[in-house]
From Swiss-Prot:
Keyword line: Cell membrane, Membrane, Transmembrane, Transmembrane helix
Name this protein carries in UniProt: UPF0391 membrane protein Meso_3392
Residue intervals passing through the bilayer: 4-24, 33-53
GO cellular component, one term: plasma membrane
UniProt similarity note: Belongs to the UPF0391 family.
Membrane topology: Multi-pass membrane protein
Subcellular location(s) per record: Cell membrane
Keyword Transmembrane helix belongs to the record: yes
């Protein structure tokens, strides 16, 4: 999933440099959503490990 975040960030950067602002915005929105999902899963994993210990 981290690979997809990096790909979307690169697409957003390139699209922004080329003047395709709507594509850049869409790619950034996708990256933000994936970052939120990764953070939630990370917190759930950490809390699960703490609860087991």
């Amino acid at each position: 999933m981290l690979k997809w975040i990096l790909i979307l960030l690169i697409v957003a950067a390139v699209a922004g440099l080329l003047g395709m602002h709507s594509l850049a915005g869409a790619a950034m929105t996708g990256a933000k959503i994936l970052i939120a999902i990764v953070l939630i899963l990370f917190l759930l994993a950490v809390l699960g490990i703490i609860a087991i210990a």
